[in-house]
Amino acid sequence: MPKYAQTINIEGHSGIHSEEYERIVFTRGNYSAVTIAGDYNVIIINAGCRFDGKFVVSGDYNKITIHNDVNFNNGILIGADTSSTVGQGNHIKCLGKTFITRDPNDYNDHTQYALQINGNYTHWEGSGMNTKVALQTASGKTTYACVIGRQASDGNAVSTPTKWCIVEKTNFMVLYDGSSNGSGKYSMYVNGSTHGAIACGHLITNNWFGTLGEYDTSISAGQDTTGGGGQVVIVAGTTRFVENHIQPVYTGGSNLQVAGKRDIVLFNHVAHGGSYGAVVDEDNVIFSGNLVYWNDAKNSSTEPIRNNSSADRIVFAGNRGGQKASISTNATNSQVGNNELGTL
């Protein structure tokens, strides 16, 4: 019988699946750890599935469709923890309500991810606000709702950078358990190390980043989401961050940090910044058409948008910012024009 002409129905069958060129269906039920190790499969995860172990996709070029009411309770890893060349070219599409998280009782001693994308050419496609990737904070532990090109084993970037990924139409959140858990809480962190100078080529678009809390100056600064970096941190070079919405941090830090060379940041809504709404730290970035407002306590002395004095040839154009009526323009040879700044 030709491939794809038969269906492999999997009911409660956890473990490693090494099939290739097959049509695999996960039927409604509970699963422990699952690994998709085969290549070129069409995989359907039916409504009502629950995965209590980690869901790993280490095979290449699989098409995975996730239907309504599916829970991944111990995270998803696309690729391998320390490699960008494992689990390449997979397309994961969510059609309905999907929830990806981690059990705090299973956290390691330092770094936690809910959605870890390490394989090159990954396309993650959510279904808007119905697709939620959320992680609860924990004292003394760094928590990331989503990372691209980073290792859970030591919290660092993979040595060979992950490239050419698309992440879209997903709700990424950091959740608080009611106590002050310090810094190092991120909704998304993209690559790292020296990858800012490398053309990683990611597209991150039409996502919502937040914390489920509104801006509140009465909350301890130790309870912010940022740790001085940003709720969303883009270190990968030549990355496009387009038409995203970043909701409140608490106090301190910044909402968006752009630390990759030649990144393009367009048409984003960056709300409720801490120290700054957005910070641009690297050369040749285009930052245009963004709405960035409400820095720390609406302080009129702090810029909503800041560029680093060591950066070169940044373009800031057509942005709307508040509260201070200026952009910090320390970068060499930067072009700053046609921005509307001040009280919103």
Write out the residue ranges for each language-model feature.
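Glycine-rich repeat segments that build the extracellular carbohydrate-interaction surface of secreted
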Residues: 1-29, 38, 42-46, 59, ...
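Extracellular beta-strand-rich, repetitive "passenger/adhesive" scaffolds
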Residues: 1-2, 27-29, 46-50, 65-70, ...
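Glycine-rich beta-solenoid repeat tracts in large extracellular/virion proteins
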Residues: 8-11, 15-17, 32-39, 50-60, ...
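Fold-core signature of tandem repeat domains
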Residues: 24, 34-36, 43-45, 57, ...
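Consensus "Asn ladder" position of solenoid repeat domains
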Residues: 62, 90, 120, 127, ...
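Short beta-strand/loop motifs in extracellular/secreted proteins, especially
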Residues: 202, 263, 285, 314
